[in-house]
Amino acid sequence: MLGSGNEEMSTLPGLNQIQLEGFCRFIDRGLTEGLFKFPKIEDTDQEIEFQLFAETYQLLEPLINEKDAVYESLTYSAELYVSTGLIWKSSRDIKKQTIFVGNIPLMNSLGTSIVNGIYRIVINQILQSPGIYYRSELDPNGISVYTGTIISDWGGRLELEIDKKARIWARVSRKQKISILILLSAMGSNLSEILENVCYPEIFVSFLNDKDKKKIGSKENAILEFYRQFACVGGDPVFSESLWKELQKKFFQQRCELGRIGRRNMNQKLNLDIPQNNTFLLPRDILTAASHLIGMKFGMALLDDINHLKNKRIRSVADLLQDQFGLALVRLENMVRGTICGAIRHKLIPTPQNLVTSTPLTTTYESFFGLHPLSQVLDQTNPLTEIVHGRKLSYLGPGGLTGRTASFRIRDIHPSHYGRICPIDTSEGINVGLIGSLAIHARIGIWGAIESPFFEISERSKRIRMLYLSPSIDEYYMVATGNSLALTRDIQEEQIVPARYRQEFLTIAWEQVHLRSIYPFQYFSIGASLIPFIEHNDANRALMSSNMQRQAVPLSQSEKCIVGTGLECQVALDSGVSAIADHEGNIVYTDTDRIFLFVNGDTLSIPLTIYQRSNKNTCMHQKPQVHRGKFIKKGQILADGAATVGGELALGKNVLVAYMPWEGYNSEDAVLISERLVYEDIFTSFHIRKYEIQTHMTSYGSERITNKIPHLEANLLRNLDKNGIVILGSWVETGDVLVGKLTPQMAKESSYSPEDRLLRAILGIQVSTSKETCLKLPIGGRGRVIDVRWIQKKGGSSYNPETIRISILQKREIKVGDKVAGRHGNKGIVSKILSRQDMPYLQDGEPVDMVFNPLGVPSRMNVGQIFECSLGLSGGMLDKHYRITPFDERYEQEASRKLVFSELYEASKKTSNPWIFEPEYPGKSKIFDGRTGNSFKQPAIMGKTYILKLIHQVDDKIHGRSSGHYALVTQQPLRGRAKQGGQRVGEMEVWALEGFGVAHILQEMLTYKSDHIKTRQEVLGTTIIGGTIPKPTDAPESFRLLVRELRSLAMELNHFLVSEKNFRIHRKEA
């Protein structure tokens, strides 16, 4: 963010800045630090020494561009070259060589990486910051137990605990603890040093007996005692160097390495002056921590709030990539050490080129981007989704929390979150509160803390200064809130203002204020900042709106919103979906594929994205917005991308809506829509699906791609060319063959003809047949073939098979079952598409496009949609667009309502339509029934609302099954649309059928429509001949499975039939 010295003006930071800064920090510092830690490697005889020279590493430019990497399923990476040296100690000869170490995936200008042709992004993680934290808990007797927990940079914990006798223990686990004196002696301190450097020596002396004095008499005795309690399996250990190394590896390395951030936190918390480069836990740290713990017991210090952001740190993309780089260098070290020993054993002369291989680094980063929980496939549903995905903050992941163990206190909003983590935008479900979003003005500092900007208020100087403060600093200042959120200082500050100080809200004089917020949007994420009139909505509905805006699909004809917040331009710009001019010049030529720009005597070709598939199967497409001969300035928009218009974010459409009931078709969040939305392609979207198939080398030969497929109808093969691949531009339906493929296999003995058996018996010839393994279009995949790609890898081995990739474009109009939503959490499913003449219409004869249920507003308390609806009506009439900053009530009361009514009044005057604003019921109007022409009894709210079409579409969900596969164990239909599964009649469904007394339907559902093998086979034949469906006579397979499982537990279960006459029992096996 940039601040002006004379004016209170600021610009938003780059929304991708958090990702780009992290990756640049890794390239600038992380690579050098990792290479400097690489040790010198010697052979067993210490005659040869290998080392890396970290000062002279090189990163080469990628050989391919981003688009080619995506199209060819490659990784957009740079080659890393490092200077190495091999030294012969006897002759002091040195052989230097620059060697290729491996590939490092790069980050593009949008903050994403391309790995195997897929856009991926690394999520920032929130972890407990290394350091020491004091807390108090009650024991079973109700007595307070004070503890100090030291958290290492590895995540290991060492807990200092003081009991009721004022004895201090070091606890490693719940059951294991040891005296702090033994721990300090094992770390190298003697008793006199301990007593000299502690604040309360008499307490340490009080619980020291003769036995303990013997244990801490020397460092060796203390180490033996420490090892005996924590690491010894059995026997009486003897001190040795290997024992000390084992103890270091098992205990000290994991629990005592603080790291750079941990050392800083320890120094600040305990008032120490230990150098920053000393990142290991020292005896002085433990002594000072013990003194603080004793003072805590006597009420001389404060407990720590573990959920405060000052006690958290952000593990950014730089830290994750650096950790993986260190892991790769450890693997490289082991590989080099083994290669040197092998070369000496076989009396070979090693060279740096033979010792170093690129496999450790390349495979480490491939596995990280492909398998790590914090490396995710980029959500490319729309431009907003791409931006928001890179700004997520997660408590989950390695070293973090889990969704099932996290408490409510961790999930809840903390006062330190304000201005740093959005209090609204989080995921729904089990991860609620654990995945947040960075506030729009926040940034990550060099120490891993989230910093928020403030304006400093100084009486001495009139110059405004903007500060970025961490959570540990701003809580000590008086921060003004409320009316001080005004955008200008023209408003006279009141004498008494509300302020925030140390997580409390106070009312103080203006002279006592130190800082004030810079913008009303400062507290919210990008998703929440795009909601107009958000202050009039319930927080739960604002949360839903933030999530649903990320689910909106780009429409074929985008339209920017009439009522917005002003951030739409920034989101569209930083998303990178629009083509921006890098130079000024004249447009020479333009078409749908590229734009030619004449700059300083040269002609630059600017390629455009044409019908490219995103990770969410939506369509990414750029449309030129400039014409031939036009002069273009630097930074001007050349082409709009998906879901952008004129450089602004455009996720939906402004449609005319009315809030009224209509024959029950809009009850319970159902939505009634007009057929105009279908015929005029108002909510039509394009979706691109990718289908691929590979050819492998089998034990009976290689698979063949061909258009001659036996036993298949010619109609299914009509779109194949002579090579057996679908023709570009073909229209394909469900079941059509996209790629014809035959897989060779051996035929069974019983299927051989007499001639084949004779040949096998006389000549030993193996007769083989081929199995049809074609790529067929699955259910719901109808569309137009827009791309065919045959990727042939060099070598053609079975490990690098050939891949054929087909892309199919679908045009989807809005239909019954699709999900639509507004920007206020008002969502619904399309229930009926009504003809235009039957839709309710306004007083000027215009039919409405959508009818919402008015009962969905008051109970959900999202009144912002009513303000937007009425203001959108006036904007549509006046051809105006509004950009409303939230919390406009900071100027005056009822500011939003006054704005809306004044604009409605102006629209009614200028258009000479008095029904737009009627004083008797402002904002409402009489609406007429399109079927009868009569007006409805009560006036209703109507206007223009910005409606989104979400990615939850009926074409992806609707499913039916007549017959299909059954599970092998339970013999019941499979589950899921992808497996052509059936519906499950569960416990509650059985209750419902029982309640209606439909015994025969219930029997059908539980037997031959489900898992009664014998009867369901007989049903088909009797249905064909028109016979009576047989009744099942024995138990279904699920009951048999229950019996078998009980038998596996040594329990026998049988059922018996009792006759009515003599009650004799006839045993029948289950």
Swiss-Prot record:
The entry's cellular-component GO terms read: chloroplast; DNA-directed RNA polymerase complex; mitochondrion
Provide any one GO MF term from the record: ribonucleoside binding
E.C. designation(s) = 2.7.7.6
Entries under InterPro entries matching the protein: DNA-dir_RNA_pol_bsu_ext_1_sf (IPR042107), DNA-dir_RNA_pol_su2 (IPR015712), DNA-dir_RNAP_su2_dom (IPR007120), DNA-dir_RNAP_su2_hyb_sf (IPR037033), RNA_pol_bsu_bac (IPR010243), RNA_pol_bsu_CS (IPR007121), RNA_pol_Rpb2_2 (IPR007642), RNA_pol_Rpb2_2_sf (IPR037034)
Q: Where in the cell is it found?
A: Plastid, Chloroplast
Q: Where are the transmembrane segments?
A: none
Q: Which UniProt keywords apply?
A: Chloroplast, DNA-directed RNA polymerase, Nucleotidyltransferase, Plastid, Transcription, Transferase
What SUPFAM superfamilies does this protein's entry cite? beta and beta-prime subunits of DNA dependent RNA-polymerase (SSF64484)
Reaction catalysed?
A: RNA(n) + a ribonucleoside 5'-triphosphate = RNA(n+1) + diphosphate
Q: Does the keyword RNA-binding apply?
A: no
Keyword hit for Plastid: yes
Q: Which GO terms describe its biological process?
A: DNA-templated transcription
Under NCBIfam families, the record lists: PRK00405.1
The job of this chain, per UniProt, is described as:
DNA-dependent RNA polymerase catalyzes the transcription of DNA into RNA using the four ribonucleoside triphosphates as substrates.
Quaternary structure annotation from Swiss-Prot or TrEMBL: In plastids the minimal PEP RNA polymerase catalytic core is composed of four subunits: alpha, beta, beta', and beta''. When a (nuclear-encoded) sigma factor is associated with the core the holoenzyme is formed, which can initiate transcription.
Family the UniProt entry places it in? Belongs to the RNA polymerase beta chain family.
Q: What is this protein called?
A: DNA-directed RNA polymerase subunit beta
Q: What gene name is listed for this protein? A: rpoB
